[in-house]
């Protein structure tokens, strides 16, 4: 978590002799702390890109409070021009090899248990596998019988309609009456065939 600023040149110049902060009559302790912070190089500052001149937020707050108490026309945001928040590098602790190995072992165990759970119902017993072909044959015969029954039903209803239509010409002279009579007879025959077909299918399903 950030707790300090990387001071810019504006703040450094303001604290130098003759700078903007000199006429603000800073308390001796606050000035000494700011000078110590701005004059001290942070660890790793020998590097050209390394951080230096770190000022804590506490010192910035004290400086801001002093400027407000004096009703100064020098504003803090002007002094902090060019400054940046300093985020220290977070060093990750090394991982425990024993803990890593234990976690990998747990992952493998969980994966094996999940695989066994998924494939538990896939394997079949020898007796069940042996009866697959016979069961398939029964299903094929049942489907074939159902198709033949439906075909016979359609043919029977159509034949009843045609016969009634042709035979009713000796009774009715109007075509509408002949068609109506043929529909009535075909419906009765269809219902009878449907009843017989349903009973037959119930018997076959009961055997299965």
Swiss-Prot record:
Q: Which GO terms describe its biological process?
A: cellular response to increased oxygen levels; intracellular iron ion homeostasis; lysosomal lumen acidification; lysosomal protein catabolic process; vacuolar proton-transporting V-type ATPase complex assembly
Q: Does the keyword Iron apply?
A: no
Question: How is this protein situated with respect to the membrane?
Answer: Multi-pass membrane protein
- N-acetylalanine: residues bearing it: 2
One MF term from GO for this chain?
oxysterol binding
Q: Which GO terms describe its cellular component?
A: COPI-coated vesicle membrane; endomembrane system; endoplasmic reticulum; endoplasmic reticulum membrane; endoplasmic reticulum-Golgi intermediate compartment membrane; lysosome; vacuolar proton-transporting V-type ATPase complex
Q: Where in the cell is it found?
A: Cytoplasmic vesicle, COPI-coated vesicle membrane; Endoplasmic reticulum-Golgi intermediate compartment membrane; Endoplasmic reticulum membrane
The primary site where this protein sits is membrane
Q: Is Acetylation one of the keywords?
A: yes
Entry superkingdom: Eukaryota
The residues that cross the membrane are 146-166, 179-199
Cite the entry's keywords alphabetically: Acetylation, Cytoplasmic vesicle, Endoplasmic reticulum, Membrane, Transmembrane, Transmembrane helix
Function as written in the Swiss-Prot or TrEMBL entry: Accessory component of the proton-transporting vacuolar (V)-ATPase protein pump involved in intracellular iron homeostasis. In aerobic conditions, required for intracellular iron homeostasis, thus triggering the activity of Fe(2+) prolyl hydroxylase (PHD) enzymes, and leading to HIF1A hydroxylation and subsequent proteasomal degradation. Necessary for endolysosomal acidification and lysosomal degradation. May be involved in Golgi homeostasis. Binds 20(S)-hydroxycholesterol (20(S)-OHC).
Describe its partners and assembly state: Accessory component of the multisubunit proton-transporting vacuolar (V)-ATPase protein pump.
Q: Which protein is depicted?
A: Vacuolar ATPase assembly protein VMA12
- Give the species this sequence originates from: Rattus norvegicus
Q: Which gene encodes it?
A: Vma12
